[in-house]
């Protein structure tokens, strides 16, 4: 059976303006915390990108950056295969 991926909107205390986040749950278990980059300290091209702030299990140690939320989702799905 294919694992079920769900996302929960959450605000993340990052110490910057990057607060918009998503908990990534795989079959109800926390797999990652994604954060949308919005701080003016980032390069303009990076603003709006999504970053794996923290990963667990198969995403442990993966601090990847994605141009969009959809790209992040696609990468997580590929890593589950």
What is the meaning of each model-derived region?
Residues 68-71:
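Alpha-helix N-cap recognition
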Residues 1-30:
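Negatively charged, low-complexity tracts enriched in Asp/Glu with abundant Ser/Thr
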Residues 1-2, 77-81:
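Short intrinsically disordered terminal tails
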Residues 33-62, 79-81:
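Short aromatic-glycine-(Arg/Gly/Cys) micro-motifs in beta-strand/loop hairpins
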């Amino acid at each position: 059976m294919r694992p079920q991926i769900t996302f929960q909107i959450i605000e993340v205390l990052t110490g910057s303006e990057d607060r918009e986040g998503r908990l990534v749950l795989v079959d109800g278990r926390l797999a990652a915390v994604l954060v949308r980059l919005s701080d003016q300290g980032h390069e303009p091209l990076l603003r709006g990108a999504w970053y794996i702030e923290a990963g667990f299990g198969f995403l442990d140690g993966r601090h990847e950056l994605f141009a969009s939320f959809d790209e992040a989702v696609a990468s997580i799905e590929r890593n589950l295969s």
